[in-house]
């Protein structure tokens, strides 16, 4: 279980907090959508969660492990894929996955890499340099790298951007399978229709604060998620 309590972050020289009193609970098996417009605080929350940003107040705990008190051990149990991941493009796909495995000090066999790559239909491209990959293929190799050490939590920032419909469908099926086995997924997206159909839980952030969170059906009520989202944003 991931628990975020009272998370507050203020950037240097800023007049106000970027995010304030963020409280979220993600349980094993959850596919948790995180939505809000540009500048609402999604990226700041995510960067605090994965240890890129420090924060002034609050706590982030994964199965009782604090990111502040045990940052290295915490990060070993999560993965993060940004919307435009930086990859070592001079490496082949196989070399990149082996590199990531070594960073996590994981003993991963060639068979493990090939089997995971097959789920993304990338097994025939593993020996090619990443610089020759399309955007969608680069997104796939980043996801394979994120999953190879079997994290408890994977954090995705706009994971479906640049993926063709087949690749997006395959990714959703893979995420469903992983979550059925107990992994947690937390992802931001501007595609509300995908979030509504795909996520069992949702949080909406506005002006750095969570304005609604919980089960998808509870957040949207009898309306569509788009209607519920717009209604919340029309309120001052």
Model-assigned labels for residue ranges:
Residues 1-4, 8-21, 71:
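A short, flexible loop at the N-terminus of ABC-type nucleotide-binding domains that lies
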Residues 58-69, 73-74:
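Conserved ABC transporter NBD signature motif
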Residues 98, 102, 108-125:
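Conserved ABC ATPase "signature" region
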Residues 143:
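Hydrophobic anchor residue at the start of the ABC signature
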Residues 154-158:
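Catalytic Walker B motif of ABC-type/P-loop ATPase nucleotide-binding domains
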Residues 213-214:
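ABC ATPase "signature
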